[in-house]
Regions:
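Small-residue-centered hinge/linker elements
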Residues: 1-191
Length: 191
């Protein structure tokens, strides 16, 4: 996007509000004019719009900070990490970031943790559960329905087809998933 796509009139000492109540996508959803006629609200925001806007805001002397309004930071861990990194760059410009929510999920708090100050409603909820992974297995269902799968697999650490071959997780897949979750958790905690 070009800079003129973002140009708006900004007053002195402006605080930007980042409302995360809608999903955050890699790319902005396409704007189809027929949605306007149906009065359908925007489905969410794209990192391709948010990150350049944060970069421009970091160098705009009229903008003094950002207020993150966390109502449910939906968008997947990778998108939240990218957004948080964009906020970190904004903060490195010497401007403040504040965060407020009626309650924080783990994802909300991860995003808000880049802020200088985090506020929660006095009767709000903070819900941390850690990370988990679930795998659905189909072998028994296939046997009951008479369906058989023809699978070719080489090596122990090839788990994509496991749900069709087994009724439970193999030790190798358990190790892989545990490693991925540990890496993601470490990234979240270290930041």
């Amino acid at each position: 996007l070009e800079q003129e796509d973002f140009e708006v009139e900004i007053d002195e000492k402006t605080v930007l509000v980042l409302d995360t109540s809608k999903p955050i996508f890699d790319r902005e959803p396409q704007d189809f004019s027929f949605f306007d006629a149906l009065e359908i609200e925007s489905a969410g925001f794209g990192l391709n719009t948010i990150l350049p806007a944060l970069e421009m805001a970091s160098s705009d002397d009229k903008i003094i900070g950002i207020s993150i309004k966390n109502m449910s930071a939906a968008g997947g861990t990778s998108n939240l990490i990218a957004l948080r990194n964009g906020l970190k760059k904004f903060k490195e410009s010497g401007k403040f970031i504040k965060a407020y929510s009626d309650g924080y999920t783990q994802a909300d708090y991860f995003l808000a943790s880049i802020a200088d100050s985090i506020f929660v409603h006095p009767e709000g909820l903070v819900d941390f559960r850690g990370l988990s992974a679930e795998v659905m297995y189909y072998k028994s269902a296939q046997e009951k329905s008479g369906v058989t799968m023809e699978v070719i697999r080489q090596g122990k650490y090839k788990s994509a087809v496991e749900p069709y071959l087994f009724d439970k997780m193999s030790n190798e897949n358990r190790i892989q998933i545990k490693t991925i979750l540990s890496d993601v958790w470490s990234e979240m905690v270290d930041d």
